[in-house]
Amino acid sequence: MKTLTPPRVTDTTLRDGSHAMRHQFTREQVRAIVAALDEAGVPVIEVTHGDGLAGSSIQYGFSATSELELIEEAAKTAKRAKIAALLLPGIGTRRELSAAIERGIKVVRIATQCTEADISEQHFGMAKEMGLETVGFLMMAHMRPPEFLAEQAALMESYGADCVYIVDSAGAMLPDDVRRRVAALKERLSIQVGFHAHNNLGLAIGNTLAAIEEGADQVDGCLRGLGAGAGNAPTELIAAVLDKLGINPGLDVFKLMDAAEYIVAPIMPYQPIPDRDAITIGYAGVYSTFLLHARHIAAEFGLDPREILVELGRRQAVAGQEDWILDVALDILRRKRAAEGAGDAREPAAAERSAD
């Protein structure tokens, strides 16, 4: 077995968990969660809207409390931990990043689709100019082979990234998928490599462990697994596993368990689990945001939304391509009618309504 080293753990309850909370975190909740994580030895705590700085919008969902207020509360509360923020090119700008720095962030995590690292050059540049630690996120990383991801990660390194993450946004990877991708980045880069898991196939902890076994320097978790889809790797479970492996980076396992049980669990609207919908997202390999749209259109056409999602995954649809859902539904309907001997399917009137 390889010699393992303790990874740095970033808790993203207050960012990825914001999706599950519908972006309704309060200052009081942030204060309580940050205090507990800080006391338990978590070195980095991410705090923003689920879609990053400036994510609060009609498109992504409005925050109940300004993310800048939440960041400020987190920075005031943390005694040792660094506060991090997520930034997506095309959503967050220099203005929001500057404002977040004024409120106390020390780390920015810059996320792009795994095929679009080149759009992050300006963002890494300005973040380094502002004195931040910079982390790159290659989202939907299951969609491209390891060698391609290594090339994209190398671009981020050249722009100034201090670490690049393999991000399993859809929770679609198997442990060997993770190993090969992390290994490719470790071989190519001279900077740190990270891994961010989702639990749609029930593999968040197993995949995180696979990443650590391949040398991942940083990993992510959320208390109680609170996150998008079926959630993330639970921070308290990561701590327990690392402790059993003898590579605990200084986390208090019991305090994290208590934080999950007594602080986060009571405010959760639901417990993220790999239910039918989450499994479908992981199996199909698509963003969880596609789910409601697929359900709506499937109901109009009398289709199973899972058929639509699986086909979207086959076509490698990514966020922003929700308009594909209608086309995919019509294609499936045509194929079914042709198979039934109906010949060319006429587009139902519902198609016109959905396209409006």
Swiss-Prot record:
Mn(2+) binds at residues 16, 196, 198. Signal peptide: none annotated. InterPro entries: 2-IPM_HCS-like (IPR050073), 4OH_2_O-val_aldolase (IPR017629), Aldolase_TIM (IPR013785), DmpG_comm (IPR012425), DRE_TIM_HOA (IPR035685), PYR_CT (IPR000891). Residues 7-257 form the Pyruvate carboxyltransferase domain. CDD domains: DRE_TIM_HOA. The record marks 15 as: Transition state stabilizer. Substrate binds at residues 15-16, 169, 196, 287. The active site is at 19 (proton acceptor). Its EC number is 4.1.3.39. Keywords: Aromatic hydrocarbons catabolism, Lyase, Manganese, Metal-binding. GO terms for molecular function: 2-isopropylmalate synthase activity; 4-hydroxy-2-oxovalerate aldolase activity; manganese ion binding. One of its GO terms (biological process) is L-leucine biosynthetic process. It catalyses: (S)-4-hydroxy-2-oxopentanoate = acetaldehyde + pyruvate. Coiled coil: none annotated. It is an enzyme of class 4 (lyase). Transmembrane segments: none annotated. Belongs to the 4-hydroxy-2-oxovalerate aldolase family. This is 4-hydroxy-2-oxovalerate aldolase.
